[in-house]
């Protein structure tokens, strides 16, 4: 049922002098969906201004008739058109100027109540250098109140959207790609301040009595989200670098035909009974130093018999995914520079990581770069990890890209263009049977890819940040997300942190298992080097994740059709309950599962709020049922993820206790790599002799 909306443009003038340019005004939006402040269900927009090189100019709005919805006023020598247009239960608010060539910024403020809650904007917990989001002792979580956020994509936890929702029943999306700034009641406790660069200013203000409706509406407007193939929801394995070694981790000579570390992983996982449907190969995989990314060619010394290896993995129901980046190396770099295919404003000559990036606004440059991607797709590669795009990218100076926009405007626009360019060529070769996974995102990215949480810290606070990031990403319209299990930066490989992270990862749409130091849980650079506990936990949760493939796929379809993410912060499912806004470490996973990951070392209990309207069965103790609408303390050993099934749901997670006992027993026995390697060698020799086989 559509909510009747009343639009009232209220004149609130504060006369500092007789000059019209110094008058202040406000726009008042009235909606039954808004929670009342002092008895009024209104949203007040004031402090409207624009800036030029000569400074700030306040905007007066006079006699704006609601039936017309717009008015022209003069301020600072400019004709300013202010427009407010109701759209069903929402509003579009726009500011335009004539002339606009000297306009550098626009701004406004929205009134805030003392306890109002805000979330969205970015996956990182707090703005600034990414390590602040996993600093020891960090207290900030989902709520952005009290934070200032620069809306410019920062490396390397880099999923952003200029969209936030409020607990008062509204949400704001700033359209466009220009950098901006949000101030959530920091400089003024009674206001949210929004400022964005650019010649015009365009906002959509959503209203709904249900926060989930705000999330759904924005996700569809900004998407709809990409629908991955079902196999994307299988467990993954990856390493940061692959070397070709003469022996396996235990000293067994390598006789098999492919990269030794890939063979080791595949053979060991098979022996342990750890399911794996995707093997992602990070850089370097090509010739050239230091990146191993020259000309989209495969380094046959590092990855011998690559095309045959892809077929071997395919026969094992394992897809091959490669790392890529939006720059040129090798012979392509010289040709791209000669033809003017690279971004203006980059430092030359090339130094550090400042490799020539493709100008994705130039069709010829894009096609030239896409030809490299096509070479890999022809080899059977089924997807790509899209790194970079937000790091070492020019953003200041008088430079313009091919289509005429400034490099400043190009800054946030680049990641969506990057993923779209890869999507176009992958779609041509593979139809719908592929996925892409960038680390950087902005509005416009979601129709083309799934996402991962960047180079997160490998500490307990890094796990904490990931629990927040997956929920923030869901709110922003990025439903399919995963993190580097055990972390990437500052990786300590602590047993308890890795174990808890494996458990958390199983209840993510993407479960991608490193760890990053080019090792596995059977040859760690600390004691125990062969960590049977982590191998057992990996097996337990990889098998659980495998059982959830159909469940994950079902909710990915729902996200694409309706905008509702599978990861649901509790305020999306039980917004009337105060604990749903404060118990940030617990989320609903689809309709039928509730998960409460533990991130702190030494912790063996968890406070869990159970959403009202249902009762919840303990996945570890099926006789234990918790009534919704209450908070309970639950026990959880180091291998146990607090996990609950909605009573009446048809979801089979298996016998987790039995699975754990089996996993411990299996992990305690080291596989015979000599026998496994010999089996693979026989298969290869038979295949080479023309005998076929898989």
Mark where each language-model region is.
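Sec/Tat signal peptide C-region and signal peptidase I cleavage site
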Residues: 17-21
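Catalytic-domain carbohydrate-binding cleft regions of carbohydrate-active enzymes
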Residues: 23-42, 74-76, 87-90, 98-647, ...
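Extended, loop-rich substrate-binding clefts of extracytoplasmic carbohydrate-active enzymes
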Residues: 52-98
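Bacterial N-terminal signal peptides that target proteins for export
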Residues: 1-7
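Generic short beta-strand
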Residues: 32-34, 41, 47-48, 71, ...
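Catalytic and substrate-binding regions of extracellular carbohydrate-active enzymes
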Residues: 40-68, 665-676, 682-684
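Bacterial N-terminal signal peptides
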Residues: 8-16
